[in-house]
Design a protein with these regions (language model features):
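STAS-like cytosolic regulatory interaction modules
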Residues: 1-58, 69-106
Length: 106
């Protein structure tokens, strides 16, 4: 079975950009949190964690939980987190769960 998920993390202009593609669900939740959390040391004091979700094809409550876990980790580290290129299906989940204050969109 082909892998339906990928995450690439890179430093860009003092920010950490995590590009997520495929299905963001329970099967990949721990991988997302550990991969991105491990990169937070590379953020400048005025930098951000940018979660680029433009290639996400599916997100369930576990995927949302991973994003909220990352939000808590960035908050604890004094780093801002924003979501970029949020697909309509993910936007609907964010709207239904009323987490816009926790997960602002760019």
């Amino acid at each position: 079975m082909p892998k339906s998920f990928d995450i690439q993390v890179a430093a860009e202009d003092g920010d950490i950009v995590a590009r997520v593609s495929g299905e963001l669900d329970l099967a990949v939740r721990d991988e997302v949190v550990s991969t991105v959390s491990g990169a937070l040391d590379g953020v400048r004091p005025d930098g951000r964690l940018v979660a680029d979700l433009g290639a996400v094809t599916f997100c369930d409550s576990s995927g949302l939980g991973a994003l909220l876990d990352l939000r808590r980790a960035t908050s604890d580290a004094g780093i801002r987190m924003v979501l970029r290129d949020v697909p309509p299906q993910v936007a609907r989940l964010l709207d239904l769960t009323d987490v816009d204050g926790w997960l602002p969109r760019e």
